[in-house]
Amino acid sequence: MGNGTEEDYNFVFKVVLIGESGVGKTNLLSRFTRNEFSHDSRTTIGVEFSTRTVMLGTAAVKAQIWDTAGLERYRAITSAYYRGAVGALLVFDLTKHQTYAVVERWLKELYDHAEATIVVMLVGNKSDLSQAREVPTEEARMFAENNGLLFLETSALDSTNVELAFETVLKEIFAKVSKQRQNSIRTNAITLGSAQAGQEPGPGEKRACCISL
C-alpha cells in the first residue's frame, strides 16, 4: 500500500476509532497519519479527524480517520460521529482487562448507529507492554471470530502492526465497494450522483465526500 497525494484520490473512506478513554486511539491515529507518538496522556475534548491518502492497486483512497478525542468519557458520542463510516477500529488496552470487558457494549453502539455492512477490526493496543498483559491474545481473537470482526494487536509506541491494521481495514472496505460496483454494473442499476458507492468522479467533477457501503 503506497502513499498518494492529498489532492488526487478516487474514493474517501470514513473510518472511526472507538473504545474506552486511554486505550491509545489518538496515538494510533497520529502514528498512521503523521508517524507521530505523544507521551502526553492529557485528553483533548472534542471530535477530530486526520487524513492520509494511500494507493490500493491503481486506486487512490483517502482515509478519513475520526477520533472521539475523549468524548467517550462522557458518553457524548452522537450518531453524527458514526454517520457515513464504512470502517471502524474498536480499540482496547491489552494491559487493562476492563477496557476489553466493554468491547461488546461498544460494538452494540456501533451497530446501532452505523450501517450493518461496516468493516470492523478489534484492536488490542499496547503490545509493547507484554509483561503487563491482562487480555490473552486467543481470548480476544476468539471474540473477534465469533462476532465476524478482524483482529490485530498493535503498538502505537513502536509502530507494530499500525500500518497493517489500517491497511487491512481499508483493503476490506475497498473490496466491498469494488464488488458492489461490479454488481451494480452487471444489473445496470447504477444510480447517478456523487454519493453513489463505488462511483469514481469524472474529469472536472467534484469528488464524493464519502463512500457508503
UniProtKB/Swiss-Prot annotation:
GO terms for molecular function: G protein activity; GTP binding; GTPase activity; myosin V binding. Its EC number is 3.6.5.2. Residues 211-213 form a propeptide. Mg(2+) binds at T26, T44, D67. Its main location: membrane. The modification Cysteine methyl ester is found at C210. Pfam families: Ras. A motif (Switch 2) lies at residues 67-84. CDD domains: Rab11_like. GTP binds at residues 21, 24-27, 38-39, 43-44, 70, 125-126, 128, 156-157. GO terms for cellular component: cytoplasmic vesicle; extracellular exosome; Golgi apparatus; plasma membrane; pseudopodium; pseudopodium membrane; recycling endosome. Its cofactor is Mg(2+). It is an enzyme of class 3 (hydrolase). A lipid is attached at C209, C210 (S-geranylgeranyl cysteine). It is found in: Cell membrane; Cytoplasmic vesicle; Cell projection, Pseudopodium membrane. Interacts (GTP-bound form) with RAB11FIP1, RAB11FIP2, RAB11FIP3 and RAB11FIP4. Interacts (via the hypervariable C-terminal region) with ITGB1 (via the cytoplasmic region); the interaction is GTP-dependent. Interacts with ITGAV. Associates with the integrin alpha-V/beta-1 heterodimer. Interacts with VPS33B. NCBIfam families: small_GTP. Belongs to the small GTPase superfamily. Rab family. This is Ras-related protein Rab-25. The gene is RAB25.
